[in-house]
Swiss-Prot record:
Pathway: Cell wall biogenesis; peptidoglycan biosynthesis. Its main location: cytoplasm. The lineage of its organism: Bacteria, Pseudomonadati, Elusimicrobiota, Elusimicrobia, Elusimicrobiales. Cell wall formation. Adds enolpyruvyl to UDP-N-acetylglucosamine. This is UDP-N-acetylglucosamine 1-carboxyvinyltransferase. Gene3D superfamilies: Enolpyruvate transferase domain. The gene is murA.
Amino acid sequence: MDRFTIKGPVKLQGEVEISGSKNAALPILMATLLTDEKCVLNRVPNLRDIRTTFKLLEVLGKKVEYNNGTAVITKNKELNSILPYELVKQMRASFWVAGPLLARLKHTQIPLPGGCAIGVRPVDIHLQGFKKFGAAESTKKGDVVISADELKPAKIVLRFPSVGATINIMMCASLIPGKTIIENAAKEPEVEDLICALKTMGAQISIDSKGRIIVEGKKTLGSMTHTVVADRIETGTFILAAAATKGDVVIKNCVPEHNDILLENLKDAGFGVSVGQGRIHITAPSNGKIKPVGIRTMPYPGFATDLQAPYMVLLCVADGGSDITEDIFENRYMHAPELVRMGADITIEKTMAKVKGVKELSGANVMASDLRGGAALVIAALCAAGDTVIDRVYHIDRGYENIEAKFAALGAKIVRDNPLKD
């Protein structure tokens, strides 16, 4: 397996361009299953999860051509409703094909998905929505089987504003003639980007003044042409890398308002934050000291759970102590013991992490256990004195395009290798 060797400390300097959002591209790619027409998606990042999705689409009957960030999806054969476990186990987002397949075929059989091992991430909210449409659910040899004789529009109230459930239910509703109302829906930019993509296919979707998603379903949808929104989590990761290393970095081709909460926290912590059209400039505190500012993860527009791990690194090098409360996922502090190996002072108490800043982190051998935790270890390595070796970087490759090249362009000394191939 590949690993990173990073020599620190370094103050990052320069400019970095943000890729298209993985979390937006994935559901939009799944949405191509809603039509037999040609779909063109631009700014698609070249990532492991994206490549897995291409394979899923091909198994289900699509032809996928990908070149230079543009994916062209066309019909190859009749849709298949059954997914292979070998692909589904690699990625939790694979369950997002359920909505389109149920809408098109009235039947789908999907193994329970894989992805990062972050606590309990159930699909029950998705299934409750499908039941409201008239579908029945059963299990068969570890697979979830969802089927219906007829699907009808419905009013659906989500018990939690789940991004995945909102996406799945909305895609399914777009092919159920009549009005579907989704209450307590997720408000993430990735949901809004999917809505934009579905509209190019002819879907009629709106968000009312109460935040409800209103879908006027159609019998068929047409072709799609869409450009994926900038990745707000990659943006936040580079913001935090610049901050933790007390660097001077301009982040380009981003959407600054998607990280408003994070930027406000950095201002409170003493950092220079300058925002322009599609760009963010981060500079170190004028007095050289990072004021500790605690966070609580919440659904958007609150603090993103996907940035909790990178933010913890910032607190590890701050002047003083502060707390992190993780209210979205269970067991999302798996990176903390690895940071402790590097000299961090972190105490975990159920959903809270108490972090006391230390004078300096030290290089160590550590292991990425999930995508965002892996990114946090990269930032910690950039702050640490000496060499840090990060194993299992395949987790990081799931969500960051050319991460080592982007950090190297900012002055990082980062090398990828595979010791088993040497």
